Amino acid sequence: MRNRALSILLAAASLLAGCGGGSDPKITVAVIGDMPYGTSPTDTSQFLANPAFINAINLDPDVSLVLHVGDIHSGKEFCTEAYDKAVFGQWKAFRSPLVYTPGDNEWADCHKIKEGGGSYNAATGKIDFALDAKGAQIDYAGGDPVANLQLVRSIYFAAPGKAIGGSTPMAVHSQAQEFDAAFPADKAYVENVWYEQSGVLFVTLNVPGGSNNDTDPWYGAPAMSAAQAQEVSARSQANNRWLATAFQRAMSNADRAVVIQLQADMWDLDGAAPSHVTQYKQFIDAIASNAKAFGKPVLLFNGDSHVYRSDNPLMAGAPCVIETAPGATAAPCNTASVPAATGNPDPYLNQPYGYNVPNFHRVTVHGSTTPLEWLKLTIDPAADAANGADAFGPFNWKRVKP
């Protein structure tokens, strides 16, 4: 009986640990993405500037966690093992633990010829791989996306259940360790994690941008291969199961808010037709339904489109601000401030499926161009801000240029 009573007390304490109690401390998170970028395979300027940028974040005594929303190089740079390891080596210098979700440029788009992959030859029905001066394939595994994702996992997620670096190691819950037993293949997604800080649940999802959730046929082939179709289907289903798991945990722990971290800007047309973002609808649907059921602030961070933006694309006509030039102060979204290639200035109209989720907010992190910057996110358990351009619920944020 005594042991049973003790078990009940411990279980209650565990539940309270995630709750919105007054004892939760205020914390600060640095959010970055789409960096270091190069304008060509030989442009190393941002890569060489990265250690100083990391040090600038380290020098902020408030920061206790770093998030990277994906893309460790540009779409004009090659996918090599040496480069992936070099960036990982730089990240070891972060004083705070780093949580990273992969971007399209380091795996899903590695097949592209401009990234050193190759191109489909209609005459032969085979792939003409990009070769270096010695006749060797430029990219790791010839740019095969699945192989490059495995490479990223082997470097950045070699220790499942642990964040990257930091002077004090941080544990996370990985889908590789906590997958649904009914779907054992989900254990492959070591990059999908969740964890809690100050009564806020954070969750990452592997959703690559720029290619309609990796459905653009690899190497420019006429249609997706069986391997590509399997990749897309398995990852998408695993993502949605993981998102549901995270929200279930947030609700059972009475967390005060949820942060979602992924790479794709699912509302950016990027110069293509609206049909080129349809494969993201499944994730938007899942986010919208889970956020609505949760009923508390849900904040999404993404990269991909490179320009700082703050809005709520799950509400038609919601306020929106956008960076009008690299480093410029954000201005209201309209036809003058939003590039035409992006689509409608109201992001809801790029995915207009009847969403009405007032407790949601999205921030696209500045990336790609200089001046380099990071987003300083403060989580104050005592705050309850209205949904605005730079604050929502326990969150407030500002752009920082070192």
Regions found by a protein language model. Name each.
Residues 28-33, 64-74, 97-102, 106-109, ...:
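Structural recognition of the beta-strand scaffold that forms the well-ordered cores
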Residues 361, 369-402:
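A short C-terminal boundary segment appended to hydrolase-like catalytic domains
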Residues 1-8:
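Bacterial N-terminal signal peptides that target proteins for export
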Residues 22-83, 255:
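N-terminal active-site segment of His-dependent metallophosphoesterases
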Residues 55-65, 196, 203, 219-314:
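His/acidic metal-ligating clusters that form di-metal
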Residues 38-40, 74-76, 105-111, 211-215, ...:
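Active-site environment of divalent metal-dependent phosphoester hydrolases
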Residues 16-18:
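C-terminal motif of bacterial Sec signal peptides marking the signal peptidase cleavage site
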Residues 78, 82-234, 316-379:
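Extended active-site neighborhood of metal-dependent phosphoesterases/phosphodiesterases
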